[in-house]
Amino acid sequence: MDGMRRMPPNRSFEMKKVVVFTGAGVSADSGLSTFRDADGLWADYRIEDVCTPEALRDNRAQVVDFYNMRRREMLGKEPNAGHRAIAGLEECFDVDVITQNVDNLHERAGSSHVTHLHGELTKLRSSRDPELIVPIDGWEQRLDATAPDGALLRPHIVFFGEAVPMFERAAEIAGTADLMVVVGTSLAVYPAASLVRYVRPDVPIFLVDPGNPDTAMIRNPLTHIRSRAAEGMPELAERLKSEFS
């Protein structure tokens, strides 16, 4: 996202860089379905039927309908306390959010700089040119909608089996962190999970997740807060502001 970062007066050169890496657990706390859920939108669909290039080729109508449903679900949800706490870090830090989530709840909570690794529900792209990306107004993509280049539009989502074009940029951002916060992710989806390897070895990493994420790749000083995002992130945000700003 473009635009100036919000900075308190006379503190721009003191501000530490906080990189926040978020996963499905943050969205789940707003009531959004995730592909690991046993219920919700994903319960009636196999991933290979709605989230692969082959599915788009062989059953375009089902794929478009599925993402219309996801988009409509997203528009009916609100950012939770975890999203708001992450956005609130900008009061004291230079913050970049890297998310595996395809919803826009970080932006709606007020985060200024969000990198979406796996695409965005609020956008469509040309089936011919992956760089030709357009916003979608509302939740419904028409089956016959075309891009400015005349090609059929598709969801701006990184399907399973496709490259993750924003990963290199995300790795660069991770390498600039003075503090790293990892929220609501099992650290099991690659290449996204490997972002923690790009953080400088002396940088503290704070992990907020109620489960047992795979931390084998983390060699940094690690603090694990065993809470859901909406509960643990507000507490951690206050701690970071108190100890590091």
Indicate residue ranges for each PLM-predicted region.
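Conserved catalytic core of sirtuin-type NAD+-dependent deacylases
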Residues: 2-245
